[in-house]
Amino acid sequence: LSEEKRYIMHFPEENTIMSINSNYGGNVLLGKKCFALRIASFLGKNEGWMAEHMLILGITNPKGEKKYVAAAFPSACGKTNLAMLIPPKSYLEKGYKIECVGDDIAWIRVGEDGRLWAVNPENGFFGVAPGTNMKSNPNALLSTMKNTIFTNVVQNLDDNTVWWEGLDKNPPKNAIDWKGNPWNGDVKDADGKPVKGAHPNSRFTAPAINCPCISDQFEAPNGVPLSAIIFGGRRAKTAPLVYQSKDWNNGVFVGSIMASETTAAATGAVGVVRRDPMAMRPFIGYNMGDYFKHWIEMGEKIANKPKIFNVNWFRTDDNGNFIWPGFGDNMRVLDWIIDRCEDKVDAIETPIGFVPKAEDINVDGLEDVTLDTIKELLTVDVENWKKEAEGIEQFYGEITRVPEELKAELANLKANLNK
């Protein structure tokens, strides 16, 4: 493995991938990001379908009615957690159910009924191990109990089990770390800092059929029909908890401006906005402007379009604390999204799109979240968004061939903010 001579090459026109001297999962497991997103996105553009970096989940209500949504998030935004969500107790008691069709990749095409249909081309989950535990994501952890490959985690030599940071508070005393060195949970480096046993990007590779909440449509050849597409990012103040786009092209605009703010203090740059359109920035196999145009053109072919939403679980108060509880309680936002898809609730128009009426977000059983909290989470700060519009303009300026439709959406946004 030579860092100086490391090549990951994709030749979309020839349907060829070459990976040399890499040991990074996404660049060596060539069926995953390299083929199923980079090459497949190019094939999809030419053949009239879409390869997207999206989870697919099913939501069943107490009447037994099932709806499916696809969702795209940049890394570190809880995509796998959402794909395997366990609803709050109050929802479970009523009979709501969440099923996972896929946690990472969706191949999407227009069905004969004019709806968008999505399949998960993968056979399992390639998940980040550190931080996965029975509280953060029980379904992911339970998926790893058999027929699972673990890479770069701690090996407990006493009972031949695995461990990683964030699994529990009991690291093994007689183990080897991800580099193969002896490790006992209390190793320090030359500066006296603790040495982690598992690599931060260590992984588990588990068959999807192991997952307790895997959908019975997981292997359906036609896939599942999408009622909604959800985009998301990590924003402290800008984006509200949830908003709905005004139409398909506006939804493509919302996806194209997806962003997260950097949180790692170690890099020294906190709060820097990193644009990651549709969470596909590392995976688009051709020109980004042409990719946006493909989304616009797909909209022209879909008779029964899914509605498009944006969510932000990461709004913070002035002390930097998250306001929304997240995790299983994100079900409450999915609930509203499905209600909007079925025209069961009204919404309030803002310069950026439609936000819920605060009373339409179910807060039953939430201790620290009141109607006023929800109102705060749904505010659209016009001055903040004027700055955001400048950032979007700058981002569009860095891309070639941005479709005129998206430039028009940006102009509309600016006009709405100045009304």
Q: What are the language-model segments listed below?
A:
Residues 19, 24, 36-42, 60-72, ...:
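Glycine- and acidic
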Residues 113-125:
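A short alpha/beta connector and helix-capping loop motif
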Residues 3-4, 128-133, 138-146, 150-419:
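Conserved NTP phosphate-binding and transfer environment spanning the P-loop NTPase/kinase superfamily
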Residues 93-110:
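Short beta-strand-centered segment that lines the nucleotide-binding/catalytic pocket of NTP-utilizing
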Residues 66-91:
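Glycine-rich phosphate-binding P-loop
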Residues 53-61:
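Pre-Walker A adenine-sensing motif
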Residues 60-64, 109-115:
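Short acidic-glycine loop/turn motifs at beta-strand connectors
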Residues 1-53:
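Charged, amphipathic alpha-helical linker segments immediately N-terminal to NTP-binding catalytic cores
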